[in-house]
Amino acid sequence: MLTTNRSDASAATGIGRRTLLGALPLAGIALAMPSLVRATTGTPLEVWKDPNCGCCHDWVLHMEAAGFTVKVHDTGNNAVRARLGLPQKLGSCHTALVGGYLIEGHVPASDVRALLQQKPKALGLAVPGMPIGSPGMDGPAYGNRRDPYDVLLVARDGSTRVFKSHNGKAST
């Protein structure tokens, strides 16, 4: 009678214990890959801004640091803002699109994440003007000054309500 070290199941499949043990690390890597891909790709965000605007560039860096994958159009933002239906009075120096929502101005990444999680029926978020202390307007050139400001939820009809108030302390 011929004896082997294989169990009946491994003999039937031709897969030995060593082969199986060697494949386990590869299986672990394969299972981890989707999360690795998600971690490196981030949430896509498209931005229209003036090529010479430093605060817009700093806001883009803020969004990238928060895990967004940013595509920048250095063509200005007036045309895209008008095309998307944002009232001029809510305008700022850059306009973005993420997850079907418009983001106008220096909106903190945490507020954009909250918007994407809550999924309200709205045009998007806006921080009119350029409040000092908001992301992108918070560098050393501003002397660590942080003014209070509101992030507005903009309805499709152009009306607004406060989405989140920032009291002048460090925003995320």
Predicted regions and their residues:
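Thiol/selenol-based redox catalytic cores and closely related redox-interacting motifs
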Residues: 89-172
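Conserved dinucleotide-binding and phosphotransfer motif residues
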Residues: 66
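Solvent-exposed, acidic/flexible segments
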Residues: 49-52, 56, 86-89, 105-109
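Thiol-based oxidoreductase modules, predominantly thioredoxin-like and allied folds used
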Residues: 70-80, 90, 98
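Solvent-exposed loop/turn segments at secondary-structure junctions
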Residues: 52-54, 77-79, 102-103, 131-133
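Typically the conserved alpha-helix immediately C-terminal to a functionally engaged Cys/Sec
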Residues: 59-62
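C-terminal segment of N-terminal export signals and the immediately downstream linker at the start
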Residues: 35-52
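N-terminal secretory signal peptides
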Residues: 1-15, 26-31
